[in-house]
């Protein structure tokens, strides 16, 4: 009996140690962007049009609802393809869906040729009304890569990708044009140049005041 208890204790401790080790390798980051649109306009694209993310994402070439899902909502599922052969993909599920707060958590339950561990990969989407026809779109992500040592390197790439996603969302809302891998380079220049010009104007005003 004592031997059995010892074995069970060791198994439990071992499981806890593995879980703790896995959690330590989880990477997190949070990015946000103020957009010149109402919160309702932004939410319509990132929340209500969940299955059509390919229309407003620079890397996803095709997306759709799966497993009987017909629209956004609690438990809605989608697939996102990142290459023409559809071998690189993410299957995702929407949970904690709150249209009142304009927020949801996006979980990954299957990854095809994509270096993330679905069990430890998820992101919280949140749209906040800032008034005057503007809103803030924030993206709070945690993930673990496979292999785990790639996490630190992948973190920077993921942050850049989400910042590009913000630009794609902005362009899609403004023009109605679908964003693709092919046209995003041109699209990005339009918005990055405008932001740089705006920053320069602020600096010029500041220097003039001095």
Question: Could you describe each region identified by the protein language model?
Answer:
Residues 1-25:
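Bacterial Sec-dependent N-terminal signal peptides
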Residues 41-46, 53, 78, 94, ...:
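Hydrophobic pocket/interface hotspot
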Residues 31-33, 80, 89-96, 120-129:
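Hydrophobic/aromatic beta-strand elements that line small-molecule binding cavities or substrate pockets
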Residues 110-164:
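Beta-strand/loop substructures that line and gate deep hydrophobic ligand-binding cavities in soluble
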Residues 64-116, 171-176, 183-210:
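Glycine-rich portal/gate segments that line the openings of hydrophobic small-molecule binding cavities
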Residues 36-40, 95-103, 126-136:
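A short, structured loop/turn motif at beta-sheet edges
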Residues 50, 162, 166-177:
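Short amphipathic alpha-helical signal-transduction/dimerization elements
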Residues 18-67, 197, 201, 205-210:
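Hydrophobic ligand-binding cavity/cleft-lining segments
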């Amino acid at each position: 009996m004592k031997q059995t208890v010892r074995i069970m204790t060791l198994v439990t401790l071992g499981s806890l140690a593995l879980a703790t080790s896995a959690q330590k390798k989880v990477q997190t980051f949070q990015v946000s962007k103020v957009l010149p649109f109402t919160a309702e306009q932004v939410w319509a694209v990132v929340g209500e049009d969940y299955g059509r993310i390919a229309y407003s994402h620079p890397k996803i070439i095709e997306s759709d609802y799966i497993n009987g899902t017909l629209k956004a909502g609690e438990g809605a599922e989608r697939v996102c393809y990142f290459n023409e052969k559809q071998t690189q993909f993410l299957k995702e599920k929407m949970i904690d869906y709150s249209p009142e707060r304009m927020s949801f958590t996006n979980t990954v339950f299957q990854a095809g040729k994509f270096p993330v561990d679905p069990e430890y990969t998820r992101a919280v989407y949140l749209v906040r009304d800032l008034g005057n026809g503007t809103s803030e779109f924030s993206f709070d992500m945690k993930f673990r890569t496979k292999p785990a040592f790639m996490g630190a390197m992948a973190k920077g790439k993921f942050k850049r990708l989400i910042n590009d996603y913000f630009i794609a969302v902005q362009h899609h809302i403004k023009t109605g044009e679908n964003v693709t891998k092919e046209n995003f380079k041109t699209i990005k220049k339009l918005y990055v140049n405008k932001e740089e010009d705006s920053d320069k104007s602020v600096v010029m005003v500041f220097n003039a005041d001095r």
